[in-house]
């Protein structure tokens, strides 16, 4: 199974920790966080790993190498300019277009059953399934409203306090059909939550939710460490 790990961000909210390293290399329990993530994915059977690179990419390559120490095969894809989340995955299209693939952020720290997530997508009729989790304060994340069939009816990226209509926050993890590449412009800055998902819903495509159970965090800000 294939997974695309997005590692191109500069981690500005984590400065000064990211002046000398990219976010995925911030240490957790004496190891770069990306090593914990790849080990978890490998244990679940995601052995074909595509990593999008931008800021301080050499450090990520040094942390993972060819992936053999973690039981995976790693392919690196570099961004020449900032492409956003969906744009960075589009840049790696040729490595991902054969089958549905998992997308995760390189700063994620999880013990979630992402294999269950992947299988749930294979069994539904959506172009993309979005991992959601219930949290107390969703203002730093995208939020979604779902119906009884787990179909996403509304999605809002980083709502202000007056715009909150749900406590189901996007984990930033998705399972996508290769068809999504038809809706992402090449070489342009384009985000999943801000651009792609609203456009797909406007065009009438079905987006489904998977409700995560377990521990999920990221190293995106100091309070998350």
Regions found by a protein language model. Give the residues of each.
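Structural beta-sheet core signal
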Residues: 5, 51, 103, 128-131, ...
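A structural signal for short hydrophobic beta-strand segments in well-ordered beta-sheet cores
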Residues: 25, 144-146, 197, 209
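Well-ordered alpha-helical segments embedded in enzymatic catalytic cores
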Residues: 33-36, 88-91, 196
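N-terminal glycine-rich phosphate-binding loop and ensuing alpha1 helix
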Residues: 1-58
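Catalytic-core segments of class I nucleotidyltransferases/pyrophosphorylases
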Residues: 46, 100-102, 109, 115-122, ...
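Residues at the starts of beta-strands that form the adenosine-phosphate
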Residues: 2, 47-49, 73, 127-128, ...
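Conserved beta-loop-beta/alpha segment of the NTase-like Rossmann-fold superfamily
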Residues: 61-62, 66-148, 183-185
